[in-house]
Amino acid sequence: MSYSEKTTVDPLLRDLDEKKESFRRNVVSLATELKQVRGRLVSQEQSFLKETITRKEAEKRGKNMEMEICKLQKRLEERNCQLEASASAADKFIKELEEFRLKLDTTKQTAEASADSAQSTKIQCSMLKQQLDDKTRSLREQEDRMTQLGHQLDDLQRGLSLRECSEKQLREEVRRIEREVTEAIAKAGIGGMDSELQKLLEDVSPMKFERMNRLVEVKDEEITKLKDEIRLMSGQWKHKTKELESQLEKQRRTDQDLKKKVLKLEFCLQEARSQTRKLQRKGERRDMEIKEIRDLISEKQNLNNESWDKQKFWDNSGFKIVVSMSMLMLVVVSKR
C-alpha cells in the first residue's frame, strides 16, 4: 500500500475508532440508563403495587366504614324509635300519675269530708246521748212521782174502803141500838113514856141520820173529787208516759240510725284510708318507674350522642389527611 493511501486510511480508521468508542460509550451509557430506567420502572411498579394495595385497603376500609355507618344509622334509627317509644310511655306514665294524683286528692278530700261528717255525727251522738240521759232521768223522776201517786192512790182507796166499812158498821150499830131501845120499851110496857121515847127517838134518829148522811155525802163528794183528780192525774201521767216512751223510742231509733251512720262513715273512712295508701304506693311505684325511665332515656341519649360523635369520625383531621393522601396517590397513579 502506498503512503498516500495510508495517510487517507488512517484518519478514517481514527474516525471509525472514535465513532466505535463513542458508540460504545453511548451503548454503555444507554445500558446504564436502561438499567436505571429498569430500576426506576421496578421501583415504580413496586410503588404502584403498594399504591394499588393501599388503594384496595383504603377502598375496603371505606366500604367497611360505609357498612359501619349504615349499621350505626340503623342502630341510631332503632334507638330513636326506642327513645320515642320510651318517651311516649313516659308521657303515658306521667298522665296516669297525674290522674292518680287527682284521684288521690279527691279521695283525700272525701276522706276529710267523711272524717268531718263522722266527727259531727259523733258530736251529735254525744249531744243526743246527753239529751237521752236527761230524758231518762226525767222519766225516772216521773216514774218515781208515778209510784208515789200510786202509793197515795192506794192509801186513798184503802181509806175509802175503811170509811165505807166504818159507815156500814155505824149504820148497823144505830139500827141495832134502835132495835134494842124499841124492844126495851116494848118490854117495859110504859105508854106515856113509850110515846115520849118514840118521839125522842123519832127526833133524834132523823137528826143523826141526816148528819150521818150529810157527812157521808161530803165524804162521797171528797172521794169522787179525789177519784176524778186521780183519774185526771193517771190520764195525764199515762199520756206523758206514752209521749216519753214515744220520744224515747224516737231517740233510740235516731241513736241507732246515727250509730249505723257512724259505722258506715268509719267503714268509708277506713276504705278511703286504704285507697289513699294504695294510691300512695302506686304513686311511689310510678315515680320510681318514671325515674328509671328518665334514667334510661338519659343513658340512651348519652349513648346516642357518643355514637353520633363516633359516627362523625370523617370530621377528624387524621381521617381527612388519610383521604387527601389517598386521593393524591390515586391522581398521581392515574396520570402515570
UniProtKB/Swiss-Prot annotation:
UniProt feature coiled coil, ranges: 125-261
Location of the motif Bipartite nuclear localization signal: 240-261
GO cellular component, one term: nuclear inner membrane
Main location: nucleus
Protein location: Nucleus inner membrane; Nucleus, Nucleoplasm
Keywords, in A-Z order: Coiled coil, Membrane, Nucleus, Transmembrane, Transmembrane helix
Record-annotated membrane-spanning stretches: 313-330
Topology term for the membrane: Single-pass membrane protein
Mutant lacking the gene: phenotype: Double mutants NEAP1-NEAP3 display reduced primary root growth, and altered nuclear morphology and chromatin structure.
Quaternary structure and interacting proteins, as annotated: Forms heteromers with NEAP2 and NEAP3. Interacts with SUN1; SUN2 and bZIP18.
Identification of the protein by name: Nuclear envelope-associated protein 1
